[in-house]
Amino acid sequence: MSNSNTTQETLEIMKESEKKLVEESVNKNKFISKTPSKEDVEKEGEENGLRQETQRRTSSHGHARKRAKSNSKLKLVRSLAVCEESSTPFVDGPLDTQDIIQLHISCPSDKEEEKSTKDVSEKEDKDKSKEKVPRKMLSRDSSQEYTDSTGIDLHEFLVNTLKKNPRDRMMLLKLEQEILDFINDNNNQFKKFPQMTSYHRMLLHRVAAYFGMDHNVDQTGKAVIINKTSSTRIPEQRFSEHIKDEKNTEFQQRFILKRDDASMDRDDNQMRVPLQDGRRSKSIEEREEEYQRVRERIFARETGQNGYLNDIRLSKEAFSSSSHKRRQIFRGNREGLSRTSSSRQSSTDSELKSLEPRPWSSTDSDGSVRSMRPPVTKASSFSGISILTRGDSIGSSKGGSAGRLSRPGMALGAPEVCNQVTSPQSVRGLLPCTAQQQQQQQQQQQQLPALPPTPQHQPPLNNHMISQPVPALQPSPQPVQFSPSSCPQVLLPVSPPQQYNMAEDLSNPFGQMSLSRQGSTEAADPSSALFQPPLISQHPQQASFIMASAGQPLPTSNYSTSSHAPPTQQVLPPQGYMQPPQQIQVSYYPPGQYPNSNQQYRPLSHPVAYSPQRGQQLPQASQQPGLQPMMSNQQQTAYQGMLGVQQPQNQGLLSNQRSSMGGQMQGLVVQYTPLPSYQVPVGSDSQNVVQPSFQQPMLVPASQSVQGGLPTGGVPVYYSMIPPAQQNGTSPSVGFLQPPGSEQYQMPQSPSPCSPPQMSQQYSGVSPSGPGVVVMQLNVPNGPQAPQNPSMVQWSHCKYYSVEQRGQKPGDLYSPDGSPQANAQMGSSPVTSPTQSPAPSPVTSLSNVCTGLSPLPVLTPFPRPGGPAQGDGRYSLLGQPLQYNLSICPPLLHGQSTYTVHQGQSGLKHGNRGKRQALKSASTDLGTADVVLGRVLEVTDLPEGITRTEADKLFTQLAMSGAKIQWLKDAQGLPGAGGGDNSGTAENGRHPDLAALYTIVAVFPSPLAAQNASLRLNNSVSRFKLRVAKKNYDLRILERASSQ
């Protein structure tokens, strides 16, 4: 209770001193208008007395818990502060009612209390300052013991605040400097500080009290006013002195901490140094080797997942190798694969370091050592192709004595000649080894249910599979010798300089290029061969295969290839075969297995092969009557990206190998990525309809023979193009085109998310002059890789070699101005080099390559037909830069109006523009929108007398499809292109705003959008129709027309 007694004594002393303070404050307040009056001060004194009595009562009741906060130096410090805290609500009432808010002396009770109840704290600070001054006068202690009325040691508070809080330190230093300046200024007796927060006001109150000054607030309660008093003093120590001590101690501590941390780090580093040194020295020695091992392991795994590296191995060890297993995904070979992936990593002693993880190379033949040639790795491929090993490709086995087609830098998996195995079924041979024939037959039955079975009476089939590895980077000019007698079935590998590039996830039926030929019933020794060329990485040459008829000797035993072609090229070395990365899948079935076809088809008089170079002729040794030679003395047909298939005497309708069609139809299926130009002339003097495609699926006759070489035996080739956006892993759709007498087949198209209306269409077509039909599906793989741009930058105008049609054909192609003119143009049209791309081509031959066969459903227009430029004058030289032909292919659908152009009719006149036909050659980036091909449709069948403004209102649906409407005057449009809406231009001349005076062209963002709009609008009750323009519209022309 000693604290309570001392508190009572102190309070009595304070009462006595209060009276003196009130008198002094009244005298000083004469100079200050805002200071409270004497009565207010007396009232406040009485209130202070009441407050102190209340504090006495509360302290006597014992707040020992809060009294523990008291300062050890001063006896009163915390007890009074706590008592005032509890008595604050009691005091607030009288103070507020009497409006005494003027005098406040710093209250060191609590920082939080001052912030929350600033008015009360300021008033308390005023009282405490009054109590403090008498204390100073009474006890003349040093400033070290200077306290306020609540017993808070101001010195200790200020020192602690200066040390612990940098912000408060700055504020205190500032206040100290201002107060010192005020004390030294004898002219002013008071100083008013600007408004500040309650916490800063509390600091100011305490600093003013520490300097022995009177401190009040103005009427707003925000600004503090200090007055000089008789007890005003300058403390013995400046604030900065306390800070220096603090700084020295703090800096020393921090320095020690940093030094400790550094020492700890050094200890850790010393502990880690041995490990790091060992690791570093190890990595220097083994990093390269380790990298190669991991790299090869990853690539080998990816190769297995892709299943594209279908290298042919004649050794039985192929079935025990896991790396070979991963290369046989599409082959269905799953037997005998017992070796684990660790076996790939165990072989590190090979000199071919990049192939170390693989203990066995799939390019090795029986007993042959691994090829020491470096592989073509994924880094040099077009689209993520795994390692493609180059090595000796064709090896001989115990079953035959085939000559070894080996050339350095070229690995072409050629079929090892196998003995015939008696089998009534057409077998899809996975490996051409006699020991594997039986399981190959089973796998064939499982994988290709659509292949028509060979009749029982036929001789045993000989199964061959050719898997082509990567061609060499530099072609070898060595001639290739091949002995045809050792192989009953001739497999002619043809290597174009551009490689095929297939997506990673094509469906199994079309996952690889397969060329299978099934002999007809009349064939003496029918054979079934399946070609599965692996995906070829970017490389000058790609090996393709042209298969001759089975049971007959090779047409030419000695093939001397040109220096441009790889020596493995047995047939034709395509000189400049310009083709973007793509893969062609060809499945060819003779008509003998087609039950509905009783007709005999003539063989092709004109070979379908690669044309090596202009004027080049390949020798042929012998020809069997039932087999047309793969190469003839004639100029080789220009073949831009498709495999030419020679047809025996008995060749029927060609169609897709779909299970739905079973053994009824035989087809030629071609898969490839977009952007190449394709020419497949079938028959001598046949017309080439080159149908390169970029985005859209389409089925159009690719070639029709109408001239004297094959008056009735020409086999038209139809393309079916499907862009990668429409595949999405689905099997490609193939159009089935039949001879005129055959019934129609319902062919459900594979689902295409981009073109839902084309889910099911009836594909029926009539061969132009002969019943034979070749259906080629050009299926774009939907892989993650972007379509590679071919080196060709131009397409010459399509020379379609008099695309006139025979009268007996139900649907006719558009004919040019005249067949002689077209042929003349073909022969004289030069190939425009890439550097000449901006220059217009002088070719004026037929540019519209799309046929108008009414029963032929066209999936989508082919955007870019390519044309010949060199060669024999009719066919473009392979490898020459192709020019884009700005022709628009009509998206003919079943039930859509056909466009029949009779012989002599100039439906597509390029002559009206002469040789000034504007051609915008596509640059290397074929995705540019300069070439307007399948994206342009003409608006026809508008209501008569409709004006342009009214017509624009009808085109809202086109605008919703993203189409831009271009109004071309008749001078710019094609006569008659408006479908009759501009036929009355003469009489409508007085109505310049009539829509009939214009050729209305809708330019869609993509051929697919044009296709969908044509399907939607032409089949609806819309007041206009859309059709593919008969004229080649250059985008520049359309832009100029739109700007007028």
Curated annotation (Swiss-Prot):
The keyword S-adenosyl-L-methionine does not apply. Residues 233-303 form the SUZ domain. Residues 23-71, 106-147, 261-288, 320-408, 433-485, 502-533, 551-600, 729-770, 807-848 are annotated as: Disordered. Pfam families: R3H (PF01424), SUZ (PF12752). The modification Phosphoserine is found at residues 37, 143, 362, 365, 381, 921, 923. The modification Phosphothreonine is found at residues 924, 928. One of its GO terms (cellular component) is nucleus. Residues 58-71 have a biased composition (Basic residues). Residues 338-349, 433-449, 757-770 have a biased composition (Low complexity). Signal peptide: none annotated. Gene3D superfamilies: R3H-like domain. Residues 509-521, 554-572, 818-848 have a biased composition (Polar residues). Transmembrane segments: none annotated. Keywords: Nucleus, Phosphoprotein. One of its GO terms (molecular function) is nucleic acid binding. This is R3H domain-containing protein 2. It comes from Mus musculus (Mouse). The lineage of its organism: Eukaryota, Metazoa, Chordata, Craniata, Vertebrata.
